[in-house]
Amino acid sequence: METKNRLFVLALDGTPFSLLNQLMSEGIMPNFRQLVHKGDFRELYSVQPPLSSVAWASFMTGAKPAEHGISGFVERDPQTMDWFVPKADRLKKKPLLQILSEKGKRVFSMNVPLTYPPYKVNGILISGFLNKDIRKGTYPAPIGAFLKAKGYVIDADVETGKRDLQAFFEQLEFVLEKRVEMMFHFYQQEKWDFFMTHIMETDRLHHFFWKYFSEDLPPFAEKFRQFYRRIDEIIGKVQRMLPDDTALLLLSDHGFTRLKYEVYLNRWLVENGYLLYEQMPPKSPKDIHPFSKAFSLYPGRIYINLKGREKNGNVNAGPEYEWLCEELANKLKTLRAPDGQPVIAQVHRGFELYGIPAQAGSALFIDPLRLGIVPDLLAIPNKGYDLKGVLWHDRLFDQTVFTGTHTFDDAFLFYQGIEISPKAKSIDTLTREILKFFGGM
């Protein structure tokens, strides 16, 4: 057998290990079922928090959020109180594409989150969903004009999904077909060393249609299966297309489950006296009153309004800070949903979760000024609860058009022709395995 020295990666955003097993047992995915007998198929874990931008940044860098610098879809500037969407230019670690490029490998990447703005690679980089104009989202730049002319679409319009589910489903199908068309087009152009395509449409499908599938509700239960039949056809075509010298890696970045309630943590902080606003409703983070003790960013990231760190901080580092963190954690764990179930499974100290060493080896001596993007507390919800971070909502619990939400567990990993250590159990540990495949760079 020919030695495999090239790698094809297909990422299905948010596709659960358990879902693939169910669909295979139902006969929906015969190509994938055949494929798993030829390789290794197992559960994969995400990172905390299990968000696409955070998890794929970890995949690309082999680092935890505290190391690569992305801890959510939204970050804060503690000096100005501005909130902003972090992009690839804020990564603190060199991404896999650049490492491979510097070693002379030819690389291709399409639609992977946290690759916008595009950066120079030895090959082609097509940015993902933070990019609004494909003509400005590629390296080299002329690729963007080519994609635009071919009708390539970066992402489906989520606002359409809030108004018209049928129209949104049709959009998902259209975007998928354009993505796959371009994937096969570019793959045929040359012999790539590393070729990766990311499909965001599976994540979008789950957010809007999970209820219909899990409860077998017409008409979208069958459409959900229809979508995965098409995914299976794509997997089958990829398998047949790959030459003998190319290994195959399929994966997702997090799992999914039925969404019970959206939970608005800043509302909870207001109701419990920890968060005050200059005006109601608040229009921006700058409306957070200096007397506030804490605020939250999505999902479940809680920041103490700390003196010397936040612009208008009023909580002293030391005993006052430690006491407040402990009080918030204890109260959050008592929060119950309208159905009587506990919302919060765990509340972690940020430095513990991300491995930041405490001074003198004790949490009592942790310097919160060193945390950077790391939240003081990270609330981990029980499955089915989505901890929102908007400044204000008219109720603590809500149910909307979204019917699926992320999980830390139940992502999936399939690999054939590449060795992956059994110890590589989370998405951030795969980078090292890929680099080993390419000679231990």
Segments the model singles out, each with a brief description of its role:
Residues 114, 178-187, 361, 374, ...:
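Amphipathic alpha-helical blocks
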Residues 2, 169-195, 205-249, 321-336, ...:
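A long, amphipathic alpha-helix that forms part
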Residues 380-430:
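Low-complexity, glycine/alanine/valine/leucine- and proline-rich hydrophobic stretches
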Residues 24-27, 124-126, 211-216, 262-271, ...:
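Short secondary-structure boundary/capping segments
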Residues 2-3, 12, 21, 73-103, ...:
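Secreted, luminal/periplasmic, and some membrane-associated catalytic domains
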